Amino acid sequence: MNADLAQRIESFLASQHVMSLATWGPDGPHATNLFFACDGLKLIWVSDPDSRHSLQIEADPRVAATVAPDCSDFSAIRGVQLNGTAKRVTAADERVRHLGRLEARYAFLRQLADGPTKLREAYARTAVYKLQPAAIILIDNSQGFGHKEMLKIDA
């Protein structure tokens, strides 16, 4: 694995907060926007296990995702495209570790403990998910129109 490219991807991901996750199910493709945190190059998030994307991950773990800031100048386009597999984190120690990453990144998650009952209950029902990328493409038009670098991840 190209360590320099991996580091640039990690730095970019750390500067962003929303990914668009694409899943597949009986009704076709589905995309959803999610807050995320990183564990190296793995993306972590929480979701209702009964949400459409969560159910689709349980049925078929193959996913794709993009992370990109909004911009109006094509030369400023930067982002990543990922494909790999997603799964629900079931090991208690791993779940606690990943929740810690998310709560460290997003203050509103820490504040839910003192928030309204409905929000606390909804958060308590969430499941932790992890995307293990197989490949990541870093896009950076500041390096030239359509500039892309691919990082293959060894399983």
Where is each model-derived feature located?
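Short, surface-exposed beta-strand-loop junctions and turns on beta-sheet-rich folds
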Residues: 51-53, 72, 144-146
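A generic structural signal for nonpolar/aromatic side chains embedded in well-ordered alpha-helices
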Residues: 13, 56-57, 102
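Extreme N-terminal tail/first-helix region
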Residues: 1-18
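Structured helix-beta-strand junction loops
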Residues: 15-16, 59-60, 134
